[in-house]
């Protein structure tokens, strides 16, 4: 049983530091959290034990936890870990930044037909996955469909789910009335899957029309409309999708569309990504990823056998097992997102040079090592283009010859794992800006002053990465801006083109596990006189100690 701790004034639970509140529910809050070692953001649902007992929802919570632990699907929110304290349960789940589909529709109105189809295809794929695992959601609605940064759908909140067995019928009436099927509000027996189909029909209608097919403030009148099954179809809806809606919103559950019927419908099949309904589903394959195991070993300074034992033990609370699944899921999320976006809008430039390469979020091409093939397009249509935020405005950019940093052909995850290991060994303190950008400081034992620098991993070319070191001097920033800069302000770590005002000095290349090589140069900002206290020398000593530790 874990205990809550304080970390820089914030609550720390296990390896996660809790931040802002994302939402408040019946049983507690949902806060954003950050894994101390990996920097991954998570959503932490905090459930108060006393409130759960007083509301008599112990069974509901247990079902939610049980169901989420079973699921590994690209469009279902994942549950990584459950941490227990004497007063609360902390459910560590996948974090998505786009908010609820409900809020998106309220803000933007109805969605374009192609976009509505894309989101609906993702939602139905997730529902099909649930049903194949004998689970019915029973409370599908736009509020329970979340959106990630790439506008992909993620189904959440399985608290009202029931495990579905052959020949077993569900009799419990639950969920939201606007989205509930007629047999649910009437208290009749129902098998399960058909009630999710009805709710999916209501969601599809909301996407296409921006309103609900059945709505009334007077609940008895609302129930009458749902039982009648009569709803308005706008003229702008094409005939094909209208027939699909009418089939899904059939009052008689025996005549209602099945997932098989929807998948075979001509409107649904248009531009359907193959990964959503694979011929041989492999979401839950029990294959151990050797590279992920090695990454966990590097982050936690443990042996491969320890990680394997944790995975084979079947203990979902084991820290090594949790870290392993975090690595796998984050890698898979990016790969899957790129696969179905590439199908409709191939990226330009160097992305095409190496189809197997995927740029993780937060990793930027180096501003002075941009391949000449990358050029600004009139309009970036592919979401992967958003990752490349430093495209040059002109191809005639002068390339810098020297940098202070380390160049490597290792994978970015491996490089950052080595950096974390070295910083921990050197007792550095750091703040994660994103997975590949850190602000680091070390206290000078003699003067008591803090020496600060920024570490940023850049993409140099298709196979090389540069870990760039940049000095951060609060007094220098104050001289340049005319105002003091807060210690933890991200503006101090903003991107600047490195220009050397000192004589560049190269050092012998160092080997890091046979893959990293280092070169030293000046990276100080020009036109600012050096201040007292030898900040420049402290900075170089800090760099040298980190490079030396990395080279071991």
From Swiss-Prot:
Region annotated AIS, chain positions: 291-376
E.C. designation(s): 2.7.11.1, 2.7.11.31
Principal EC category: transferase
Activity regulation field: Activated by phosphorylation on Thr-172. Binding of AMP to non-catalytic gamma subunit (PRKAG1, PRKAG2 or PRKAG3) results in allosteric activation, inducing phosphorylation on Thr-172. AMP-binding to gamma subunit also sustains activity by preventing dephosphorylation of Thr-172. ADP also stimulates Thr-172 phosphorylation, without stimulating already phosphorylated AMPK. ATP promotes dephosphorylation of Thr-172, rendering the enzyme inactive. Under physiological conditions AMPK mainly exists in its inactive form in complex with ATP, which is much more abundant than AMP.
Segments of skewed composition (Polar residues): 480-490
Residues given in the record as ATP binding sites: 22-30, 45
Keywords associated with the record: ATP-binding, Autophagy, Biological rhythms, Cholesterol biosynthesis, Cholesterol metabolism, Chromatin regulator, Cytoplasm, Fatty acid biosynthesis, Fatty acid metabolism, Kinase, Lipid biosynthesis, Lipid metabolism, Magnesium, Metal-binding, Nucleotide-binding, Nucleus, Phosphoprotein, Serine/threonine-protein kinase, Steroid biosynthesis, Steroid metabolism, Sterol biosynthesis, Sterol metabolism, Transcription, Transcription regulation, Transferase, Ubl conjugation, Wnt signaling pathway
Record's subcellular location: Cytoplasm; Nucleus
Sample GO molecular function, one term: protein serine/threonine kinase activity
Residues carrying Phosphoserine: 377, 491
Biased composition (Low complexity): 509-519
GO cellular component, one term: cytoplasmic stress granule
Domain of life: Eukaryota
Active-site residues, Swiss-Prot/TrEMBL: 139 (proton acceptor)
The reaction(s) this protein catalyses: L-seryl-[protein] + ATP = O-phospho-L-seryl-[protein] + ADP + H(+); L-threonyl-[protein] + ATP = O-phospho-L-threonyl-[protein] + ADP + H(+); L-seryl-[acetyl-CoA carboxylase] + ATP = O-phospho-L-seryl-[acetyl-CoA carboxylase] + ADP + H(+); L-seryl-[3-hydroxy-3-methylglutaryl-coenzyme A reductase] + ATP = O-phospho-L-seryl-[3-hydroxy-3-methylglutaryl-coenzyme A reductase] + ADP + H(+)
Positions of post-translational Phosphothreonine modification: 172, 258
Stated family: Belongs to the protein kinase superfamily. CAMK Ser/Thr protein kinase family. SNF1 subfamily.
Domain description: The AIS (autoinhibitory sequence) region shows some sequence similarity with the ubiquitin-associated domains and represses kinase activity.
Quaternary structure, from the entry: AMPK is a heterotrimer of an alpha catalytic subunit (PRKAA1 or PRKAA2), a beta (PRKAB1 or PRKAB2) and a gamma non-catalytic subunits (PRKAG1, PRKAG2 or PRKAG3). Interacts with FNIP1 and FNIP2. Interacts with DUSP29. Interacts with ARF6. The phosphorylated form at Thr-172 mediated by CamKK2 interacts with ACSS2.
Name of the protein in its database record: 5'-AMP-activated protein kinase catalytic subunit alpha-2
Gene: PRKAA2
